[in-house]
């Protein structure tokens, strides 16, 4: 059994990337894995202040918010799923905030099996920048394997992924972990 942490950065509870996260979770749980979805929008997470207080304080951020608990979950996870909608040709602000706030532990991110879930209102070509942002973060893990990627393109309206093959692919990817 693996410990799976899904970081969902969709601001919409019923947004396409969130729906795909739920499908991934369903597949992984049916395989017997322990899965936790953290919806960034539902957390109290402030922006990094770039004060380097965490570097002077043993990796503990000066901000007292929900990120401390999320970082503990992050470090315990065997599998990391990063899910984001594409906004203005990049990852969501919520995902960027999450990534920035991992700075206190960036030298101790650990080994992870990584999956991406990216949804976009336009074609697949605009997903490339978001993919670059996620890859830039993942490359800081001590050891990583990008084990799977799901792209849902041309899904502007919430819920459109339910009628596409990518919906089943998300379940299958979770089940394959």
Model-inferred region functions:
Residues 93-94, 106-149:
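Short, glycine-/small-residue-rich phosphate/pyrophosphate-handling segment
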Residues 8-10, 118-121, 153-154:
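Short, histidine-centered active-site or binding-site loop motifs used for metal coordination
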Residues 125-126, 156-159:
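Short active-site-adjacent structural elements
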Residues 1-83, 89-104, 151, 159-177:
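N-terminal beta1-alpha1-beta2 submodule of the flavodoxin-like/Rossmannoid cofactor-binding fold
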